[in-house]
């Protein structure tokens, strides 16, 4: 599982992973954000993906207690206008899992927000 947050400009962020194998994921950890919370607006995916919100009982690392699938996308594309939030304060994470059957690239962009 890959997790990366890169501050682009001000409060904007992007998270990405290249060559994500089938059934592997991009895990977005809001703890890496300057304000400890993020809101994803756009998801670009090179194939089919599931987008999940995860909760963790451990505030230092992901110990998956529950996962809710927020959306599933078939084929490559860009999902725009999302408001998917995750926060270090509430121990929530975003996981984007490749379900396409082959390796794909995944990119998520959005803003860092106050908790």
Swiss-Prot record:
Superkingdom of source: Viruses
**Protein name in UniProt:** Gp30
Q: Which organism is it from?
A: Haloferax tailed virus 1
């Amino acid at each position: 599982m890959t997790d990366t947050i890169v501050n682009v400009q001000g409060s904007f962020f992007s998270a990405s992973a290249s060559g994500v194998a089938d059934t592997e994921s991009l895990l977005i950890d809001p703890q890496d954000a300057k304000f400890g919370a993020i809101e994803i607006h756009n998801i670009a995916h090179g194939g089919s993906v599931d987008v999940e919100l995860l909760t963790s009982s451990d505030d230092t690392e992901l110990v998956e207690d529950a996962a809710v699938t927020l959306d599933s996308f078939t084929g490559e594309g860009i999902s725009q206008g999302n408001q998917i939030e995750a926060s270090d304060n509430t121990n929530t994470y975003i996981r984007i899992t490749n379900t396409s059957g082959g390796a794909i690239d995944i990119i998520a962009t959005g803003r860092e927000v106050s908790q």
